[in-house]
Amino acid sequence: MLTRKQHELLLFIHARLKETGIPPSFDEMKEALDLASKSGIHRLITALEERGFIRRLPNRARALEVLRLPDSIAPGLAAPRKFSPSVIEGGQGRSSPAPRPAANNDDETSVVSIPVMGRIAAGVPIDAIQHRTHSIGVPPDMITGGEHYALEVKGDSMIEAGIFDGDTVIIRQTQAANPGDIVVALVDEEEATLKRFRRKGASIALEAANPAYETRIFGPDRVKVQGRLVGLIRRY
């Protein structure tokens, strides 16, 4: 079974070969999948080759051949899209956000509508799935500038950060983070997780908010910050 990024890359290569007869360059693939580095493309190509979907032709630059496509092509996978986290797991921050009551969407003058991008699953990171589920109204003072989205919490991996099952976290899109921030982090261009951001020398540590989950250490090229926690909404 292919991950979404593997699936998207395979379809992008296939479409380019059908259109021009020439495989895309690594720069083109990186840009199409909105990856931070070519190393992510190398890993995806290696995974596709190991699974028998493509092969690299020897002694030829940019030589890729698509051997087969998945038996079932899911709708919406034909064109790569920018990453939008929708299934991620909880993390821990320096301080817990104070929960806010859910806003009344009927009062358009008192709320700002932002997209809910999916659910936060407790446990280890899960493959990032890109889709918008619905919208939610939040208090205007929770939106301090920039683009925002919401994620629904499911599970216990954020309990010591004061974030519980059923809560909705508000995320501000950013690629920067300070130590101790709760961030949405993209790991290896494929998996998303909500964790406490730390630096350990040249490495990055992603800490859980539950002692049952170990801190995970990654090289800096393996982690890409996608957003920072700025608020929380709780329904009663």
From Swiss-Prot:
Residues 84-107 are annotated as: Disordered. It holds the Pfam family LexA_DNA_bind. The record marks 122-123 as: Cleavage. Residues 26-46 bind DNA. Disulfide bonds: none annotated. The active site is at residues 157, 195. It catalyses: Hydrolysis of Ala-|-Gly bond in repressor LexA. Its EC number is 3.4.21.88. GO terms for biological process: DNA repair; DNA replication; negative regulation of DNA-templated transcription; proteolysis; SOS response. Keywords: Autocatalytic cleavage, DNA damage, DNA repair, DNA replication, DNA-binding, Hydrolase, Repressor, SOS response, Transcription, Transcription regulation. Transmembrane segments: none annotated. GO terms for molecular function: DNA binding; serine-type endopeptidase activity. InterPro entries: LexA (IPR006200), LexA-like (IPR039418), LexA/Signal_pep-like_sf (IPR036286), LexA_DNA-bd_dom (IPR006199), LexA_repressor (IPR050077), Peptidase_S24_LexA (IPR006197), Peptidase_S24_S26A/B/C (IPR015927), WH-like_DNA-bd_sf (IPR036388). It is an enzyme of class 3 (hydrolase). It comes from the Bacteria. Belongs to the peptidase S24 family. Represses a number of genes involved in the response to DNA damage (SOS response), including recA and lexA. In the presence of single-stranded DNA, RecA interacts with LexA causing an autocatalytic cleavage which disrupts the DNA-binding part of LexA, leading to derepression of the SOS regulon and eventually DNA repair. Homodimer. HAMAP family: LexA. This is LexA repressor. It comes from Chelativorans sp. (strain BNC1). The lineage of its organism: Bacteria, Pseudomonadati, Pseudomonadota, Alphaproteobacteria, Hyphomicrobiales.
